[in-house]
From Swiss-Prot:
Family: Belongs to the LipB family.
Gene: lipB
Pathway(s) it belongs to: Protein modification; protein lipoylation via endogenous pathway; protein N(6)-(lipoyl)lysine from octanoyl-[acyl-carrier-protein]: step 1/2
Organism: Mycobacterium tuberculosis (strain ATCC 25618 / H37Rv)
Subunit structure: Monomer.
Location(s), subcellular: Cytoplasm
Signal sequence bounds: none
Family annotation (InterPro entries): aa-tRNA-synth_II/BPL/LPL (IPR045864), BPL_LPL_catalytic (IPR004143), Octanoyltransferase (IPR000544), Octanoyltransferase_CS (IPR020605)
Gene3D superfamilies: Bira Bifunctional Protein, Domain 2
Keyword annotations of the record: Acyltransferase, Cytoplasm, Transferase
Name of the protein: Octanoyltransferase
GO molecular function: lipoyl(octanoyl) transferase activity
Top enzyme class: transferase
Catalytic residue positions: C176 (acyl-thioester intermediate)
Length: 230
């Protein structure tokens, strides 16, 4: 998995945004994807959302909020998750090189966030059969979720890194459809407040490095993580 996964050589346009409504950001992604297909730049959006539940194409009825809380149904992969204040969301709008390798792309996103955790002193990694970034334990704890879509060789949607968000928001759903694992945050793991602003620049640099092959993908599986199929 060395070398760039991108079809363009020019630098990724990193846009550090503030708090953006989910539907507004989704429309911006589509516009940037259209521009990328027409020959425009690769873009990385980094932002926060107001509190919202979003459901991927594989979400089942019993995984939705039991109290009837509204959910935005999306065209990304994966199942239901929560976005909100204290969570850094990243949307890479990237033209992928041929031959397309979506698994490779997801692994690079994971690697970038694993590196961010390492820079903060956390030994994170992967759990076999499950996307995202995990901390070891019984159960394993997910600190970052990933759900993507690739259309016309261009990526949409992306990742969400829990910094200092309210983890209680995840209790109303079955996060990512996984009932035998937990959700955590950088702040909960480190015992101090880790804000979104603290990690913005580090995340941007790591994602760009991973997509360009400067940060190689390693075989990082936390010890004591319990793999099980989706």
């Amino acid at each position: 998995m060395t070398g760039s996964i991108r079809s363009k050589l020019s630098a990724i346009d990193v846009r550090q945004l503030g708090t953006v409504d989910y539907r507004t950001a989704w429309q911006l992604q589509r516009e940037l994807a259209d521009a990328r297909v027409a020959g425009g730049a690769d873009t990385l959006l980094l932002l926060e959302h107001p509190a919202v539940y979003t459901a991927g194409r594989r979400t089942e009825t019993h995984e939705r909020p039991i109290d009837g809380t509204p959910v935005v149904d999306t065209d990304r992969g994966g199942k239901i998750t929560w976005h909100g204040p204290g969570q850094l969301v990243g949307y890479p709008i990237i033209g992928l090189a041929e031959p397309l390798d979506v698994v490779n792309y997801v692994r690079r996103l994971e690697e970038s966030l694993i590196q961010v955790c390492a820079d903060l002193g956390l030994h994170a990694g992967r759990v076999d059969g499950r996307s995202g970034v995990w901390l070891p334990g019984r159960p394993a704890r997910k600190v970052a979720a990933i759900g993507v879509r690739v259309s016309r060789a261009t990526t949409l949607h992306g990742f969400a890194l829990n910094c200092d968000c309210d983890l209680a928001a995840f209790t109303a759903i079955v996060p990512c459809g996984i009932s035998d694992a937990a959700v955590t945050s950088l702040s909960a793991e480190l015992g101090r407040t880790v804000t979104v602003d603290e990690v913005r620049a580090t995340v941007a640099a790591a994602v760009c490095a991973a997509l360009d092959g400067v940060l190689p993908v390693g075989d990082r599986v936390p010890s004591h993580a319990v793999p099980s199929p989706l």
